[in-house]
Amino acid sequence: MLKPVVLAAAFLSAFTYDAQARNHRHHYGHRAHAWCGSYLSSYLGKPDRRLALARAWAREGYNAGGPGIGVVVVWPHHVGVITGQAPNGQWIIHSGNDGGAVRTRPRSTAGAIAFRRV
């Protein structure tokens, strides 16, 4: 009788693992893998750790009044700098963490919360 119980326990233990829940504040105050703000800070030569969060750029510099070349564009969870304008009218944005990489591409500014000169 004991042998089947031991075998069953051994079998079941092969398919279980320790589940460890993360503390609900594990990434308190920022998104876990967001690095666009940190990249832009380095790219523009502004070594300020508070600029690691994209939204912090909405208070940096002064209001540009709208998009333009050299303007930092801020979305709720992303930030980049405008480097040009495509023939179709879209602004060309240079940013980090755009699809997990540093990219320069035409992009809509819809949903932007700030345009800043820094």
What are these model-derived regions, one by one?
Residues 48-101:
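...with weaker cross-activation on analogous glycine-rich loops/strands in unrelated enzymes
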Residues 20-30, 83-118:
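Aromatic- and glycine-rich peptidoglycan recognition patches
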Residues 2-8:
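Sec-dependent signal peptide recognition
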Residues 9-61, 94:
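N-terminal capping segments
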